[in-house]
Amino acid sequence: METEQPEETFPNTETNGEFGKRPAEDMEEEQAFKRSRNTDEMVELRILLQSKNAGAVIGKGGKNIKALRTDYNASVSVPDSSGPERILSISADIETIGEILKKIIPTLEEGLQLPSPTATSQLPLESDAVECLNYQHYKGSDFDCELRLLIHQSLAGGIIGVKGAKIKELRENTQTTIKLFQECCPQSTDRVVLIGGKPDRVVECIKIILDLISESPIKGRAQPYDPNFYDETYDYGGFTMMFDDRRGRPVGFPMRGRGGFDRMPPGRGGRPMPPSRRDYDDMSPRRGPPPPPPGRGGRGGSRARNLPLPPPPPPRGGDLMAYDRRGRPGDRYDGMVGFSADETWDSAIDTWSPSEWQMAYEPQGGSGYDYSYAGGRGSYGDLGGPIITTQVTIPKDLAGSIIGKGGQRIKQIRHESGASIKIDEPLEGSEDRIITITGTQDQIQNAQYLLQNSVKQYADVEGF
């Protein structure tokens, strides 16, 4: 069902050259990206949108979407959904899809941003609470944007390439950030590819990806994502999982700077640095680091105050997640070994040796705590080690202390640990819920610690 949006309209293609034929220099630049495609071949592109953006694509009385269909002789649809996400589907040849995207991107909302005197003086606010900024207020196309491409899970390998070579090449050649999420969208075989950068670069990257996957047949069962089945507890790369409403930026992508998306130092494949940990201090259930370890008094300075509690050292004999019914570490739960009842994390860290503290604070030998894991969640080669999966079990009445209101707590744990975390619904007649954690060993250990800490802090307070 197509809804009306009275204010957003596309620029006139005939009067605004920016959205008509591309200038010659742009065409020359694109010659650097060689593509052996049949330009007349019809392909389908599916983009995951926020529901609030659907109206901008559709337009008042369907004006915008009808113009796209007519002007480009393409199939364009944005089916209705009851959740916070909708899917933009475009069927046309690849070059035409690129032109349509360039016309749509400036109308999309950037995200939530708290109003400021500067913002309110430049933009008309419908509400004094929050304002949704629009890419359209930028001049030209010199701004950063992002799109979420949906692909069948069997096509992911063609984008990643052997040992990540293809995705690295895509990042470098198109100067974009690319994240391919491990977990499929709820009740589907689709995975999200998150692409960020300048609009022209993002579009070019999508065109190359379409060319890659159009040459590969889908393997196995195909169940396209239906946004009506969106699930807050899944970490699939959707807006509910990625968006940080306080800052209006997607978690894992950096704030915009003069040079576009910030890059990590050479040798990291051109991936972006994650947002500063300080942005999340006021949400963290952990209020600062533990006291400095013996012989490392320098950690007590101002720099250390911005560090979180470190992840635990390697397990001393089993899984870190073991709860009693009150949500505190117990001897065993469901056959999993944890800390004994008198050895909680509070007491355990007091016994750490200086080498354990150093390992916890400097997991990669650098100074301070390394957050590169958080920015690389779900993308190949960003994780610093082999990907493994583990499962832990908790009483179902403790799940709320982990998930939090609107899923905020589990979102934060995912972000801070860098791991993919999925909480299954309890089986019929069962009193337990299974938590599946995927990531590197360090990420899994950190996630387990954060999950345990969340239960310890909130189970009694919130009456679970």
From Swiss-Prot:
Compositional bias ranges of the Basic and acidic residues kind: 19-37, 276-285
Cross-link Glycyl lysine isopeptide (Lys-Gly) (interchain with G-Cter in SUMO1): residue positions: 34, 163, 422
Gene Ontology cellular-component annotations: anchoring junction; cell projection; chromatin; cytoplasm; nucleoplasm; nucleus; podosome; ribonucleoprotein complex
InterPro entries: KH_dom, KH_dom_type_1, KH_dom_type_1_sf, ROK_N
Cross-referenced SMART domains: KH
Gene Ontology terms: biological process: mRNA processing; negative regulation of DNA-templated transcription; regulation of mRNA splicing, via spliceosome; regulation of transcription by RNA polymerase II; RNA splicing
Keyword field contains rRNA-binding: no
Protein name: Heterogeneous nuclear ribonucleoprotein K
Species whose genome carries this gene: Bos taurus (Bovine)
